[in-house]
Design a protein with these regions (language model features):
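N-terminal intrinsically disordered/low-complexity leader segments
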Residues: 1-10
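Short helix-capping/turn signature of helix-turn-helix
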Residues: 52, 112-118
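Short coil/turn segments at alpha/beta junctions that flank glycine-rich nucleotide-binding fingerprints
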Residues: 26-30, 81, 103
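Amphipathic alpha-helical packing segments from all-alpha helical-bundle domains
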Residues: 68-79, 83, 87, 91, ...
Length: 194
């Protein structure tokens, strides 16, 4: 990757990120035209490849950028510092909703990339998933007060159960053409308060 990408104004960087998220979220890795990404970002295809050596590098950069954006937002929200599960979930929800508002296609891109089978990107995606899954589980459970739960409850399994249910909900919502962030917020608040 050409470091000149980071010298671009933030607005231009975000235009390229959002264009990549959008196009890759609509197609498989292989069938995503880089010309559409360039057009959506308002740059030429040759300039896109000036910043990113090839399509694979752009795709994997976007994948890692999603993880970075998410981790930074969650850490900034303070959700990992909470000892109460529901306070933690609420703060995490607000952080993720803000991400969805700023990067409307990022969630769909993440879900598509998570299930992508193209051998060009699959090994790198799987390696990254393993790295971040360990971080996420350990960080979330680190500060929870076990006294707030039934004795003997497996906190990690409880967390994974809620994570998988959330992922299923998001996957269902992503099957529609347009994500309604306000609807997602209302549904998750109902689930947290249930």
């Amino acid at each position: 990757m050409n470091k000149k990408f980071f010298a671009l104004p933030v607005q231009k960087q975000e235009a390229i990120l959002n264009a990549g998220f959008c196009v890759f979220s609509q197609n498989s890795y292989k069938k995503s035209p880089t010309s559409e990404i360039a057009d959506a970002a308002g740059i030429s295809k040759s300039l896109l490849f000036h910043y990113f050596y090839n399509k694979r590098e752009l795709y994997l950069f976007l994948w890692e950028k999603c993880a970075q954006i998410t981790m930074e937002a969650l850490e900034k929200s303070g959700c990992y510092e909470q000892t109460d599960l529901f306070d933690s979930m609420n703060l995490g929800l607000q952080a993720k909703l803000e991400i969805m508002r700023r990067y409307p296609h990022m969630g769909t891109f993440v879900m598509k990339a998570y299930y992508e089978k193209d051998p060009d990107v699959l090994p790198a995606i799987q390696e990254s998933i393993a790295k971040y899954a360990d971080f996420k589980t350990n960080t979330v459970l680190l500060n929870l007060n076990p006294e707030h739960f039934i004795e003997g409850l497996d906190l990690e399994m409880m967390y994974l159960d809620m994570l998988w249910a959330s992922e299923g909900y998001i996957w269902e919502k992503l099957q529609h053409d347009h994500i309604n962030v306000d609807e997602i917020e209302a549904d998750f608040i109902k689930l947290i308060d249930f």
